[in-house]
C-alpha cells in the first residue's frame, strides 16, 4: 500500500496512519506533509520506526525551502519516482 501524507503532521493523526502500515508499504510525504521529515521534528523518529519506507517529494521540499532541514534518513524522490510508487502499489491511501 502507498500512503500519501499531504497535510502537516499537526493536522492529522500520524499514529492512526502508522497502525495501518505494514512491511513492504511506502509512505510518501508531499505538500505540507514534508514538514514531518524535518530532522528536529518529533514526527520523524516515529515515521522512521514504522515498517514502511518513508520518502518525501523533492519538489515539495524545495518549494518550502526545507532542503537543508530534512532528515538525512528520509530520501527525497522525483515525480517520476512517485509515479513508479503508484505502479508498484495497487492501492493508495491519502492522509
Swiss-Prot record:
Signal peptide: none annotated. The keyword Transit peptide does not apply. It is found in: Cytoplasm. GO terms for biological process: tRNA wobble position uridine thiolation. Keywords: Cytoplasm, tRNA processing. Heterohexamer, formed by a dimer of trimers. The hexameric TusBCD complex contains 2 copies each of TusB, TusC and TusD. The TusBCD complex interacts with TusE. This is Protein TusB. It comes from Cronobacter sakazakii (strain ATCC BAA-894) (Enterobacter sakazakii). The lineage of its organism: Bacteria, Pseudomonadati, Pseudomonadota, Gammaproteobacteria, Enterobacterales. The gene is tusB.
Amino acid at each position: 500500500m502507498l500512503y500519501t501524507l499531504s497535510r502537516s503532521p499537526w493536522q492529522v493523526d500520524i499514529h492512526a496512519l502508522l497502525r495501518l502500515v505494514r512491511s513492504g508499504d511506502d509512505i510518501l510525504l508531499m505538500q505540507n506533509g514534508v514538514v514531518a521529515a524535518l530532522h528536529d521534528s518529533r514526527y520523524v523518529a516515529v515515521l522512521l520506526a514504522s515498517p514502511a519506507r518513508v520518502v518525501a517529494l523533492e519538489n515539495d521540499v524545495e518549494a518550502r525551502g526545507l532542503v537543508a532541514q530534512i532528515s538525512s534518513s528520509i530520501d527525497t524522490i522525483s515525480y517520476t519516482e512517485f509515479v513508479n510508487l503508484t505502479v508498484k502499489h495497487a492501492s493508495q491511501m491519502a492522509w
